[in-house]
Amino acid sequence: MAPPCSISSASHLLITASLPKPSLRPPRLPHPKPLPAALLALAAAAPTLPALADVPAPPPSPTQDVQVLEAPSPAANPFSNALLTAPKPTSSAAADLPEGAQWRYSEFLSAVKKGKVERVRFSKDGGLLQLTAIDGRRATVVVPNDPDLIDILATNGVDISVAEGDAAGPGGFLAFVGNLLFPFLAFAGLFFLFRRAQGGPGAGPGGLGGPMDFGRSKSKFQEVPETGVTFVDVAGADQAKLELQEVVDFLKNPDKYTALGAKIPKGCLLVGPPGTGKTLLARAVAGEAGVPFFSCAASEFVELFVGVGASRVRDLFEKAKAKAPCIVFIDEIDAVGRQRGAGLGGGNDEREQTINQLLTEMDGFAGNSGVIVLAATNRPDVLDAALLRPGRFDRQVTVDRPDVAGRVKILEVHSRGKALAKDVDFEKIARRTPGFTGADLQNLMNEAAILAARRDLKEISKDEISDALERIIAGPEKKNAVVSEEKRRLVAYHEAGHALVGALMPEYDPVAKISIIPRGQAGGLTFFAPSEERLESGLYSRSYLENQMAVALGGRVAEEVIFGQENVTTGASNDFMQVSRVARQMVERFGFSKKIGQVAIGGPGGNPFLGQQMSSQKDYSMATADVVDAEVRELVEKAYSRATQIITTHIDILHKLAQLLMEKETVDGEEFMSLFIDGQAELFVA
């Protein structure tokens, strides 16, 4: 009979059975079952080799027979995972312990309560522990914040110890490194960003342009300005050009002025409505002067952080002084140059710090020798008085809207490169565009070119320019609008009423065009050609204002006369607003009321953030307010009666004009005036 086989010898037989050497084949066992099944059973029942080394299995009984190690199922594959299957311990006490070198905390507590953990060893920080089970195996457990853990371990007789170092594993060291790594990286990042802001080592190419360049000026610098604009390209601002040409000549020929004791102007402020060419003049100065040129917008000074505005002003003038003589151009200076001292809000106003620094740089203790400051604004009334005094801005150049001659020159400049028809007359266009700025005229010619291209024309004719003018003034035509015949008739009589009253009012603006084509929010329009002299002077007589109110009410009067009181519409709402505004100004501001007298009441309120009053204050009593309302109503009623008298007297001309409008939709001034030849109309005499 073959000698009994122990578990350890069986494990040896399992290992040798998988080798290809025939000399190591295990001896045949006297068992009726096949050998591979018995070996598979041994592999499933034998513990792992490390466990056998730590806890040696007890020697088998002398009477132990190898048949007790048979596989439970003879159908099992004898070669399935023969080498990869880890042998399991045979001890019943460790049979339900978790596998692996790291246990979950719940598995650890379950094993402790079952008495299967012999000892634990905590790491120094208490975040990990290493356990030793009763079968000798070891595992690690991540320990949460459980205040009852020590009591549970002591109750179940577990030996507790604490490691002197990070004996529990690499987790403690990694945690230590992680705690130091984030502050180090944050500090290094901030250091790198501030080095970039200062332009020092690590600032990158050029040292500037980093994301932390808060305190540096963002002005554009040109050593040799190439703006592409000279004084030849600036038209319609002859007086402004003369003022600036002296500044340019001073830079080019300083000896001519210094020989007579003259000093170069330190600053020049360009003042004028939007679109009059202030920035264009500055570009022309840069193109003519031939000296270094700095340009920036005032809104670039004040941004996100407090103190940035003053810092950027200092940086700008430091660069300019290094390049002196030079020109610094600040566009829209009212963004930082507004009046100080409003004192609202109780906080610090960053704009005040910026303007204080600007005042110091322009004419402070150190001075700004060789730096000429050009600035542009369309709000000179809100600028601080200290900024406007001589020594800072020695000159204030007014760039006003061009007159007829100026508009002709501007149209000639903006028509360069455009194919124009022979019927285009710049003189007529200029007279039809009173009050237009250079930007408006440039837009007019561009819109005319777009219309000509849309119509597949080779040239720009006067029709395209006329249509573009109406588009700019009143909006695009509503070609697809569906208008009933009754509405067209009502609009025709409404516009005819405006034109008829305007034509028969003495010393009023002539009618230029009448149209019932819907444009924008208007169903029809009547164009008048205002006097050039009146626009330039800004002086309006009392009779002109009274005529203006009567003309505005002519549309409503025509509706009432033709369609009756019950069928008038809301089309005159804008006319009423205009009439009320003119009448109230005549009473409150212009002194055209006998009862109120030669006084101005109810002045406009100022903006508190400009250092002015909070709101308008009524400086008159309620009784005076009643008198003002009565005077306004009297002026409006007088204008209404004048318009009614004209329309009822010349109703035949009203019918002819309305019929002509319904047929042609558009009637020009000359065609309209031809109706008066047969009508024998006379001017209205009050």
UniProtKB/Swiss-Prot annotation:
Its EC number is 3.4.24.-. This is ATP-dependent zinc metalloprotease FTSH 1, chloroplastic. Its cofactor is Zn(2+). It comes from Oryza sativa subsp. japonica (Rice). Keywords: ATP-binding, Cell cycle, Cell division, Chloroplast, Hydrolase, Membrane, Metal-binding, Metalloprotease, Nucleotide-binding, Plastid, Protease, Thylakoid, Transit peptide, Transmembrane, Transmembrane helix, Zinc. In the N-terminal section; belongs to the AAA ATPase family. In the C-terminal section; belongs to the peptidase M41 family. One of its GO terms (cellular component) is chloroplast thylakoid membrane. Probable ATP-dependent zinc metallopeptidase. GO terms for biological process: cell division; proteolysis. InterPro entries: AAA+_ATPase, AAA_lid_3, ATPase_AAA_core, ATPase_AAA_CS, FtsH, P-loop_NTPase, Peptidase_M41, Peptidase_M41-like. It is a single-pass membrane protein. It comes from the Eukaryota. The active site is at E495. ATP binds at G272, P273, P274, G275, T276, G277, K278, T279. GO terms for molecular function: ATP binding; ATP hydrolysis activity; ATP-dependent peptidase activity; metal ion binding; metalloendopeptidase activity. Zn(2+) binds at H494, H498, D575.
